[in-house]
């Protein structure tokens, strides 16, 4: 078994400065994620943290965004953060966990993957 981690950090202002936020959200987030963002009053901190989480997963997979689509990974916020990954596309991933944090103008996310050898 292999363990990999990925991390990402982003200034909230980078998301605030996006010209067409709705278009960006539809490109990056699933319907369920958009519903969660709406429940948080479209908080820029929430959007930034969730975006960082997707980037952190792509780094842990060593694919970057491109081979991994934004829609291949979903953050579900029911009882804490649960991350779902498209296992058809990434069958070697046995388990995934992530954490998102915010502090002032920054959001950061970290992801840990367990993979088959």
Swiss-Prot record:
Keywords: Cytoplasm, Fatty acid biosynthesis, Fatty acid metabolism, Lipid biosynthesis, Lipid metabolism, Magnesium, Metal-binding, Transferase. The keyword Signal does not apply. It catalyses: apo-[ACP] + CoA = holo-[ACP] + adenosine 3',5'-bisphosphate + H(+). It is found in: Cytoplasm. GO terms for biological process: fatty acid biosynthetic process. Its cofactor is Mg(2+). GO terms for cellular component: cytoplasm. Its EC number is 2.7.8.7. The keyword Iron does not apply. Mg(2+) binds at residues 8, 55. It comes from the Bacteria. Coiled coil: none annotated. GO terms for molecular function: holo-[acyl-carrier-protein] synthase activity; magnesium ion binding. Pfam families: ACPS. Transfers the 4'-phosphopantetheine moiety from coenzyme A to a Ser of acyl-carrier-protein. Belongs to the P-Pant transferase superfamily. AcpS family. This is Holo-[acyl-carrier-protein] synthase.
